[in-house]
Amino acid sequence: MSKVKVAIIGSGNIGTDLMIKVLRNSDYLEMGAMVGIDPASDGLARAARLNVPITAEGVEGLIGLPNFDEIEIVFDATSAKAHVANNARLAPLGKRMIDLTPAAIGPYVVPAVNADEHLDAPNVNMVTCGGQATIPMVAAVSRVVPVAYAEIVASIASKSAGPGTRANIDEFTETTSEAIVAVGGARRGKAIIILNPAEPPLIMRDTVFCLVDAPDPAVHEEIRQSIEKMVGDVSAYVPGYRLKQEVQITEIPADQPVETLLVDGNRPTHQVSVFLEVEGAAHYLPAYAGNLDIMTSAGMQIAERIAQQKEATK
């Protein structure tokens, strides 16, 4: 089968890691272009060495490339603000957009949860690195018992966060919180991100708290099994994704004022706590940068599903 040509806009950490994944690992995708705005960026230099067509003139440079018409899918690894402009320029030209920023123009997609729901959408949003790591856990709980409130804390090495990630911190929390509800199935969601400055850099760690009304111990076992199955589903495309310790399900004390976190409904009886770590594949940055790995792996997973669907309908 012929591979689908893709372009990546954004030659920073995420874009460069994604390019290496496509070149090394993909049976369905082929690099058509690497696009940046800094001629001196390491990502563009690497792309040139790997014989990938490059431009340092942004989206207009991409449109001007001789092979532009051959490119079917465009990954955007810039910033939320830039993606709005890039999408406005490329969507009328028939390019499928996979948004790796928190812009969220298109529907949220987390491969382990809703990979096949939006394969025909012209633009899909990959939420955030923290969302890709934690929303599957919220969904794993909510498919067993309603989740009144879910809170996630994503801790990533400061060294792995480039200028685009830092510019998107506010959008990160807003987009992830919304996707916890829209994809994870919680009634209400909250997201917190920590850029950990520790040296040497620490591996990505994520904590997920879900408040549930589940007094039955048999349901607790169902929740644990659902979480373990979901971890397996995610690790199928992010091999470094794993539980850091056993799932904890604890009774909420009567004097704990959890009502302030709820939309409405019954008071939750238990808190489900999930502790994760994500080790990167070290395709670009070292293994501590699991936040890159989970984002780029998820994006590539969706692009490959789109390519497979296209092949199946020929």
UniProtKB/Swiss-Prot annotation:
The keyword Cytoplasm does not apply. GO terms for molecular function: acetaldehyde dehydrogenase (acetylating) activity; NAD binding. Belongs to the acetaldehyde dehydrogenase family. Coiled coil: none annotated. NAD(+) binds at S11, G12, N13, I14, S160, A161, G162, P163, G164, T165, R166, A167, N168, N291. Its EC number is 1.2.1.10. This is Acetaldehyde dehydrogenase 2. Gene3D superfamilies: Dihydrodipicolinate Reductase, domain 2, NAD(P)-binding Rossmann-like Domain. The active site is at C129. It is an enzyme of class 1 (oxidoreductase). One of its GO terms (biological process) is catabolic process. It holds the Pfam family Semialdhyde_dh. Keywords: Aromatic hydrocarbons catabolism, NAD, Oxidoreductase. The keyword Repressor does not apply. It catalyses: acetaldehyde + NAD(+) + CoA = acetyl-CoA + NADH + H(+).
